[in-house]
A protein has these predicted regions:
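Gly/Gly-Pro- and Ser/Thr-rich, intrinsically disordered tail segments characteristic of DNA damage-repair
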Residues: 79, 118-125
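Conserved phosphotransfer cores of two-component systems
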Residues: 111
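Alpha-helix capping/helix-boundary segments
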Residues: 102-103
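Surface-exposed amphipathic alpha-helical tracts and adjacent flexible/coil segments at the periphery
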Residues: 1-24, 29-31, 36, 55, ...
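Phosphodiester-processing cores and adjacent nucleic acid-binding clamps
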Residues: 52, 65-68, 81-84, 98-99
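Glycine-rich, positively charged N-terminal anion/phosphate-binding segment
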Residues: 40-59
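Glycine-rich loop at the start of a catalytic domain that most often binds anionic cofactors/ligands
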Residues: 43-48, 76-85
Length: 529
């Protein structure tokens, strides 16, 4: 029996504020690092007191907190890890994310109350490894980012139901295998395996001829230069049905070093998408009431349906269903198949040739799917033998636009679709940003038809179109009227033009505290968020 009754949206946090923001915007769980032994040293990270407060805040709202404990320790760090773990176990957090087997066994001894989640750093790429970690006490594996959907499905079909599968769905990708990289350490002495990555893969490089030392020849692909090792970002928002249908139980958003706005916007987007999945798949009604138990749609060995085709009516009625990943299990034709297991090979039935189609690109999807995946379908009469066909989960336009409203590099769908893998993004390394945060809500009052008090971040002027990012809903779009700005002392001002100052302005709709206010930039930039 599966442990979860709903897919988990797992959000990042680099500090206590980020943790609370993630919970406020719908995260089922938040992962964050302490002051030591996590894979991100750039963010402020959380103290033991922060973990106590954060865990209490999350639990009161039905969410969980996971702590990254996934460095690859050296001998001189082992006892310090043991001591830190002894303190961490009493803070109320729910799980540890580990990558080292020794640390995993230490955690079982020192902190048996904490769940163990195996980090992507461990490089789990097959069901044998997943089962081995399960036997060692893990209750979740974070699969290597290099896995395609069929590999996820095959692992899900061959591991215990109470072993969670966590998969990355959004954010930065690494040019090294699941983040295990020596590049930064080699060039700068900053150890990426201890959270200190200098990201030299994002740098621009020049060529130096052996006999002309000191003469640098730039490598230029565009006016921006050339970035030889730079990878695209991941964006699976329009494809989460494929991932959940493949057996993932937790959807992980990358970004512990990102802003509170990024955390809010992306957590809200993926939570809304999961809610749509649950309703459109018939697991819940629109009010969140359970209609039937949630389970993945993977067909396991031993299942009566394993390897058997559905009827033609059932298949063709759902012709844009979840055909994701080049199958290890053969595709099978709709009709004319003898009883029992049939290996797709050189048999034919009627006018249908039974054999692997020449081009399994596995998608007939809405044109609103934004990434580098193909919009193709299996040849007529075929369906994937390893997954039950179902209609594609449709998402509203506003939701599909959300990933473009945070700072990002060129998007891809990672390695999930074999024919359309993540690529180098060699023409630029900086983030693209078409929207910027102009303020954060401090309070709202019904005074004078509604007024919002904000902490300013960027200029707001009369006639400007802004959006309030709302938890569990589409953003509230609003054109700022003239003549309504006041400063903190109540004096009327023509515009909000001083960052980090308190102002108020008209706002007819009630908006929650800490909601981000964003606006289109007048000129899209490549400035990092």
């Amino acid at each position: 029996m599966q442990r979860r009754n709903k897919p988990e949206v797992l959000a990042p946090a680099g500090n206590l504020r980020g943790l609370k923001t993630a919970v406020d915007y719908g995260a089922d769980a938040v992962y964050c690092g302490g002051k030591s032994f996590g894979m991100r040293s750039a963010p402020k990270n959380l103290s033991l007191e922060d973990f106590e407060e954060g865990a209490r805040y999350a639990h009161e709202r039905g969410a969980r907190v996971y702590v990254t404990f996934n460095v690859l320790p050296r001998n001189n760090e082992v006892e310090a890890m043991r001591e830190y773990l002894g303190k961490l176990k009493d803070t109320g957090v729910d799980a540890l994310i580990v990558s080292d087997i020794g640390v995993m066994l230490m955690a079982k001894q020192v902190a048996p109350n904490l769940e163990l989640h195996v980090s992507t750093q461990a490089g789990v790429t097959n069901y044998q490894a997943a089962n081995a970690f399960y036997e060692l006490g893990a209750r979740r594996v974070v699969l290597a980012r290099e896995m395609d959907l069929q590999a996820v499905r095959d692992i899900r079909a061959r591991i215990p139901d109470d072993l969670d599968i966590e998969c990355f769905v959004h954010g930065a990708m690494c040019m090294a295998f699941s983040g295990r990289c020596l590049f930064s350490n080699y060039l700068t002495g900053r150890d990426g395996n201890h959270g200190e990555c200098a990201q030299p893969c994002r740098w621009k490089y020049s060529i130096v001829e052996e006999k002309r030392p000191g003469q640098y020849f730039p490598i230029e692909q565009t006016a921006e230069g050339a970035y030889l090792f730079n990878s695209q970002d991941m964006n699976m928002l329009a494809h989460i049905d494929d991932l959940l249908d493949s057996g993932a139980t937790s959807l992980k958003i990358e970004g512990r070093s990102k802003s509170a706005y990024y955390i809010a916007a992306m957590t809200n987007a993926y939570k809304t998408a999961v809610n749509e999945y649950m309703v459109q798949r018939g697991f819940e009604d629109a009010d969140g009431n359970v209609l039937k138990p949630f389970r993945d749609r993977v067909i396991r060995p031993g299942d009566p349906e394993y390897g058997k085709p559905d009827t033609e009516d059932a298949i063709m009625a759902n012709a844009d269903g979840a055909f994701a990943g080049k199958p290890d299990i053969d595709a099978v034709p709709v009709g004319g198949v003898p009883s029992g297991n049939v290996s797709a090979g050189n048999v034919s039935s009627g006018n249908i040739a039974i054999g692997e189609p020449d081009n399994l690109s596995y998608h007939a999807r809405s044109t609103r799917r934004k990434s580098n995946t193909a919009a193709e379908i299996l040849p007529e009469g075929w369906h994937h033998a390893g997954v039950r066909p179902a209609p594609h989960v449709t998402l509203p336009d506003w939701l599909l636009d959300e990933p473009d409203k945070v700072a990002h590099r060129d998007y891809s769908t990672g390695f999930y679709y074999p024919e359309h893998k993540v690529r180098q993004s060699t023409d630029r390394s900086a983030y693209f940003r078409a929207w910027l945060v102009v303020g954060e809500v401090l309070s709202w009052s019904p005074e004078d038809g509604g007024r919002v008090t904000i902490m300013s971040r960027n200029k707001i002027e009369a006639g400007q179109e802004v959006e309030f990012v709302l938890p569990g809903a589409a953003p509230f779009a609003y054109t700022v009227p003239a003549g309504g700005f006041r400063d903190a002392d109540g004096h009327w001002v023509e515009a909000i033009n001083n960052p980090a100052h308190v102002f108020s302005m008209p706002c007819p709709q009630e908006v929650p505290v800490n909601a981000a206010i964003r606006s289109r930039t007048k000129k899209p930039t490549l400035k990092a968020e």
